[in-house]
């Protein structure tokens, strides 16, 4: 049984597809206070296990740490990090009492699960405007089953998406992709996808192709499809500020970008330099941005991955101005009044600065909503934009789509990958523990960067990562520019890699 409790004036996230009546009174578990923001306090039994929180740090049992659902671009997935890329506010208590809770709140929300006090779970957020769903069941399995029913059917990709994929930030030319295809073919290692990172674009502009490297792109897509390999391009959240660039011009003309309080388009720097963010919470802007995927679909593309959609901010115009002013004062400081640590801190904190997320707004049905109040919905609605567009473009076809940032509800439109991990043994365990927690929240098509995105892998580490990938729906080897080449055929005794990936292909009839 699921009961819905409403506090204040919550923003409609559309996380659920089922309509539930609002319950009266108070939940039968813990204590709730709405006097200064929102807080839920529950005294845990010594034997209680707490599951959930989807893509979050540490173990499957979440006791003993503080987690904050606040979608964050942070490639350093160390044990002390409280936030990663997703916001999945489902917890399940299993023990003396067994129940689940979904805190449908799109801004930052903190879960102190036995950290401050070993026996106390405390959930807090700044504003008392949220929906709380309390799920009662006989077991965690029963609770997950009920929850999955009310949030709607999970995204299922096309069959080829269950095959093996190779990716690297740094593949730049057709020859780079041909070399990868040939390397796998010549070593008799099956492969279904090669991913295109940002270098395929013209100056990192969404829905463009490098004029130098990808002329006759439809023919190149067909060339690889004839080898049973699909190209899967990346799409980033920021639209480059560049007069004459059609996506930019259309967005400015129709006011489809997120704006400052004064109505001007908000400017943040990401890979292309100065960018605007499409206002994907505005249904008209969401439709417009989703329809842009047609540019590549019409050239034969069957899948995409959405990135940088927390949204990541390298710096804002306002933030960089503050850093430059401090740098100017630092340069003139001959008496040591400004400590070097202050300068270093300013440079470090300019990226993804919380102040920047308070500087721009969304237009939602004529209402101006400050971004930080709905921050965790951006990646969800960017991927929703694509998913809804796919239905319009070709309703009979399944497209591959997965995203870095997410919120519960996005599971209906795409899968996720767990972001910029490292070539560390510890991250095999971390990524393994994330998978069941993500499944609880509806994300079935999920996986990690096998081999590790950052740092240099080793032969043994890559093999063990691939062994994990055999059992994750998304099986992709991905690594960063500047790291060791990580394609399976780069290592000795290639037959071991052929065997591991071959096991996956023997499982596909059972997966699909």
PLM regions with names:
Residues 67-71, 84-87, 178, 286, ...:
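Short, hydrophobic/amphipathic alpha-helical packing segments
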Residues 2, 190-497:
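Aromatic- and carboxylate-enriched substrate-binding clefts and catalytic-loop regions
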Residues 41-43, 56-59, 74-83, 89-95, ...:
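A general structural signal for short secondary-structure junctions and capping/turn motifs
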Residues 135, 165, 222-225:
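Domain-wide signal for the mature, well-folded portions of proteins, strongly enriched
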Residues 167-169, 177-178, 183-187, 192, ...:
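C-terminal substrate/ligand-recognition segments
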